[in-house]
Amino acid sequence: MSVFLDHASTTALRKTAKTALNDALEMLGNPSSVHSQGRTTRELLEASRDALAQACGANRSEIIFNSGGTEGDNHAIKGIYWKQNQQDPTRRVIITSPTEHHAVLDPVSWLAANQGAEVHYVKLLRNGMLDFADLERLIDQHSSQIALIS
């Protein structure tokens, strides 16, 4: 028997999700168009947004669709950093792990190189786990300056 354990980058869709996706892919019409096919597609898109918002306990305006995880990580990391830094320019500290996925590490590095972010990496224990004492130290040391912890 084979067991697949790399669900970080891909996983099988549930049958109901696959059916819904296939049905949506058959629809014609750009959701930004004013013709009837576009309006029908827009209705499905907005109904999906409402369902996700309700399932997550979020506002519908907080549900943002993108093309995948890397794009989502970029939007989230940069958006949170910029928002925190805009509210308080001293909030430039990002705390992260050296074992984060590159979809996280790359925008963090970009913020350091281009936006003045100060990045601190949590130390790892010999077994590869995060050193939570070091994380606590970093939070205590930079508490008023933290923009983001990933």
Can you name each region flagged by the protein language model?
Residues 1-150:
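Pyridoxal 5′-phosphate
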